[in-house]
């Protein structure tokens, strides 16, 4: 089963266990967030939303918050000794899709438990 979700003005095709980077959303690392704007639910017979599928959502675990690559905006006006250089980095949230929910169900899968490293490996 797949879903097409919309977040941050962009659309993503997702299946369970996908890892994707989207624009920053609220949520602490390790928590489950629900993305409610589902445009398409796909299975044997796909369900198209008008504009969204009623009662459908996608549950995802927040893996990380980070910054994207630097984007440089450079403008030069030739023969005028004039230029402008600016750069920025987007705030990014890394998500793992845990499950696709239909009919207003609540997420049944919680966040994954991280395995603790043994003391010998942590010292190295």
Curated annotation (Swiss-Prot):
Residues 105-124 are annotated as: Disordered. It comes from the Bacteria. Coiled coil: none annotated. InterPro entries: bL21-like (IPR028909), bL21-like_sf (IPR036164), Ribosomal_bL21 (IPR001787). GO terms for molecular function: rRNA binding; structural constituent of ribosome. GO terms for biological process: translation. Keywords: Ribonucleoprotein, Ribosomal protein, RNA-binding, rRNA-binding. GO terms for cellular component: cytoplasm; ribonucleoprotein complex; ribosome. Pfam families: Ribosomal_L21p. The keyword Ribosomal protein applies. This protein binds to 23S rRNA in the presence of protein L20. Part of the 50S ribosomal subunit. Contacts protein L20. PANTHER family: 50S RIBOSOMAL PROTEIN L21 (PTHR21349), LARGE RIBOSOMAL SUBUNIT PROTEIN BL21M (PTHR21349:SF0). Belongs to the bacterial ribosomal protein bL21 family. NCBIfam families: L21. This is Large ribosomal subunit protein bL21. It comes from Rhodopseudomonas palustris (strain BisA53). The lineage of its organism: Bacteria, Pseudomonadati, Pseudomonadota, Alphaproteobacteria, Hyphomicrobiales.
């Amino acid at each position: 089963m797949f879903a097409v979700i919309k977040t941050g003005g962009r659309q993503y095709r997702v299946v369970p266990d996908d890892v994707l980077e989207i624009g920053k959303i609220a949520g602490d690392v390790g928590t489950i967030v629900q993305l409610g704007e589902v445009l398409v639910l796909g299975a044997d017979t796909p369900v198209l939303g008008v504009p969204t599928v009623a009662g459908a959502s996608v549950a995802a675990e927040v893996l990380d918050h980070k910054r994207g690559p630097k984007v440089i905006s450079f403008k030069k006006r030739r023969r005028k000794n004039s230029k402008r250089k600016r750069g920025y980095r987007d705030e990014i949230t890394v998500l793992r899709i845990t499950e696709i929910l239909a009919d207003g169900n609540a997420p049944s899968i919680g966040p994954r438990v991280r395995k603790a490293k043994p003391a010998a490996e942590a010292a190295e």
